[in-house]
Amino acid sequence: MEKLFERLGTENNLFNSFVSREEMELYSAIQELIRDVTDGDIKKIEIQISKVEKLTVNISGLEHQCLLFAKGELVKQRDKDQNKAMELMMKAIHITLPDFDGINPLRSNLLTFDEIMIINSIAVLHAKNGKVMDAIQLEMWLKDYMEDKIVDGKMKTAKYPMILYNLSNWFGIKGCHHEAFQMADLGVDFCVSYGNLAAFPILVSNKGVALAELGEFEEARKYLHQTITVFEAMKKTDRAQAVIDWCSMHYNIKF
């Protein structure tokens, strides 16, 4: 039922009312595992994978999809093994999308949030392996899907800005700075409307970088200064300093 609601583009708020204690324990463990993966805490990911594995011994299907995804992220982050990570991600996505080849979008399919998360990770792996156009193709699919099919909700608020952030980065790598600016600008507007503070400063930064690459240094300086101010307000002084150093080194913009 939960996945049906997701494919219809909404969140299932009835889920907690109709599950057993064991199902709720597994659901909570999987949600915690997803949070650990998002935070990139390798030790917590290892511990939570072990916990979920014990809870899924006699269960087949969708729960193993998330487990394979988490193992793929662990291999990518801890072991830096991109090939093994891709193998695990493809095993995960093939549980529900057996026809997906890892490159070509399946635009007629409805997607769950887990599938969006896995496809995004596959795109990131393509980019890390130098296949930036493959990454852009997949991420544009997810962008369009989230805009057209998914109504407002917590998962959209969390995931959609990061998809735009990735696209902004990858368009920049390919020298498509107008497109990089457009993706970052769209992400900033979304963050302001829906309150995603975590993604906001990095998207503002990408706006500034894209403008600098286009030679619009005064406008670039404005957005990069905003980025530094927000990072400092969030007490992320290391991130603020990284922006300051980057601006000085690459664009001779001093703060």
Language-model-detected regions and their locations in the chain:
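Structural signature of alpha-solenoid helical repeat junctions
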Residues: 25, 63, 107-117, 152-159, ...
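Short C-terminal boundary/hinge segments that cap the last helix of small helical domains
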Residues: 8-26
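Structural motif corresponding to the intra-repeat A-B loop/turn of tetratricopeptide repeats
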Residues: 8, 39, 78-79, 129, ...
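Amphipathic alpha-helical segments of tetratricopeptide repeats
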Residues: 49-57, 90-102, 140-151, 185-196, ...
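"A position-specific structural signal for the A-helix of alpha-solenoid helical repeats
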Residues: 31-32, 63-71, 114-121, 159, ...
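DNA major-groove recognition helix of helix-turn-helix/homeodomain DNA-binding modules
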Residues: 1-14, 254-255
